[in-house]
């Protein structure tokens, strides 16, 4: 330690004589001080990743929970739950019962309902968070009624967007007592949602022109919260959530191939429970 301090003192004196580094205030012989406090001395922080993240959205815009993907290829575990749940107090469709959504999503949905009402439309919440066990029961019941055929109307357990706590079914007043089908898209309320939901951080999870990708029938009532920046990007580029993740994964692959820090992106990579 003494030898190190002698070398440091010599270096500082040399720098002072050369006019490169102004001498700090008098320092007691045994006083410890931080080199980074001395003008002209740069200490590299090993935690800083010098590699640039090359994607339209910054890493700070990408919340791993909010962009969580749930489908047949990317199954959620039977124990997966949103980080927080809020009991919904919005206008509900008859028979909907008690409903919950992930807390940030719940707040955003309340704002969307208010925006719709301001535009002259009254919306009803029909379905929200759904646990794995509940989804399993619904899926098996659908198979029984359909002679064992998966017709794309009810997701298999682990593949349901509702399990994320970020997916919800929102219907117009004229449909609050009816069975849901794609004809609902023609209502002014659903047209308003399709045009404006991104402003509140939502996207139409299962668009009409993406059924071959999502493998789910068109659901104009199914909103999915992803956050405002991601929703705006998806809306502007005409994507479904699967296509968004395809683009995001390509950016992640390029970043890692160039030597990027895996710790910065590992939570954004989608994995399946099976």
Where are these regions (language model features)?
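Residue-level recognition of alpha-helix termini/interfacial anchor residues
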Residues: 3-4, 196
